[in-house]
């Protein structure tokens, strides 16, 4: 089972990725984790990436693809892998295809933007304990304070409505086009590709976690 999980920020990809990896016994491949590991280990690609990052630049797709290919050679990937947060752009998807990285499924978790905004902007956190609440779905007993300590809850900057909207705008411009890219490749194929086209699946990411997980597993049958 080799797959890419697509969906907007706040669509619940992280939660479902965990369930998928547990069910199929595959690792979750995060480019951020790979970069940190390569830099720490001092591999040739890690050294190259560190130079770029130290200079405040963005690590090139060539370096990222090199890291991906190295990571997929490791033993834990022999039964498959799940890409988390990669590819983010069409050039990265093209580079993966060109490098012969095989994908069985591309799974999109589709959640309307207004539902994501409500889901994320309603979160409240007790900083000291990490306990989380939601003003609508999981409210504290007393508005604005932690159930156990009575201390104030905060809304993280990342969860503020204007921040969420900005992240969704970036997703719409950069990552949303991947939905069309992969669905078209799945439907029409690509004779020049080094790997077979993936199957494209889209599920609704609205409802409780168990309902969404059931849809995910049904889509991956």
UniProtKB/Swiss-Prot annotation:
Keywords noted in UniProt: ATP-binding, Cytoplasm, Kinase, Nucleotide biosynthesis, Nucleotide-binding, Transferase
Region of interest: LID: 122-159
Pfam families noted in UniProt: ADK (PF00406), ADK_lid (PF05191)
Residues binding ATP: 10-15, 123, 132-133, 207
Catalytic activity: AMP + ATP = 2 ADP
Protein's cellular compartments: Cytoplasm
GO BP of this protein: AMP salvage
GO cellular-component term (any): cytoplasm
Binding locations of AMP: 31, 36, 57-59, 85-88, 92, 156, 167
Highest taxon of source: Bacteria
Pathway: Purine metabolism; AMP biosynthesis via salvage pathway; AMP from ADP: step 1/1
EC number: 2.7.4.3
Annotated region (NMP), positions in chain: 30-59
InterPro entries in alphabetical order: Adenyl_kin_sub, Adenylat/UMP-CMP_kin, Adenylat_kinase_CS, Adenylate_kinase_lid-dom, P-loop_NTPase
Subunit architecture: Monomer.
Annotated family: Belongs to the adenylate kinase family.
Annotated PANTHER family: NUCLEOTIDE KINASE (PTHR23359)
Function: Catalyzes the reversible transfer of the terminal phosphate group between ATP and AMP. Plays an important role in cellular energy homeostasis and in adenine nucleotide metabolism.
Protein name per Swiss-Prot or TrEMBL: Adenylate kinase
């Amino acid at each position: 089972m080799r797959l890419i999980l697509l969906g907007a920020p706040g669509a619940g990809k992280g939660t479902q990725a965990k369930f998928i990896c547990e069910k199929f016994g595959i690792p979750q491949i995060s480019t951020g984790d790979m970069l940190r590991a390569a830099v720490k280990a001092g591999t040739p690609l890690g050294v190259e990436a560190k130079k770029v990052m130290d200079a405040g630049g963005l690590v090139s797709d060539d370096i990222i693809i090199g890291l991906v290919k190295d990571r997929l050679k490791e033993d834990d990937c022999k039964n498959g892998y799940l890409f988390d947060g990669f590819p983010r752009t069409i050039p990265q998807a093209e580079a993966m295809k060109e490098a012969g990285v095989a994908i069985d499924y591309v799974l999109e978790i589709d959640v309307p933007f207004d539902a994501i905004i409500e889901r994320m902007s309603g979160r409240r956190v007790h900083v000291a304990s990490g306990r989380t609440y939601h003003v609508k779905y999981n409210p504290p007993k007393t508005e604005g304070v932690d159930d156990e300590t009575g201390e104030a809850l905060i809304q993280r900057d990342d969860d503020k409505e204007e921040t969420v909207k900005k992240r969704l705008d970036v997703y719409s411009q950069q990552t949303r086009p991947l939905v069309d890219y992969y669905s078209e490749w799945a439907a029409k194929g690509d004779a020049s590709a080094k790997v077979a086209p993936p199957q494209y699946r889209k599920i609704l990411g609205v409802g409780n976690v168990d309902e969404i997980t059931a849809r995910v597993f049904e889509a991956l049958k």
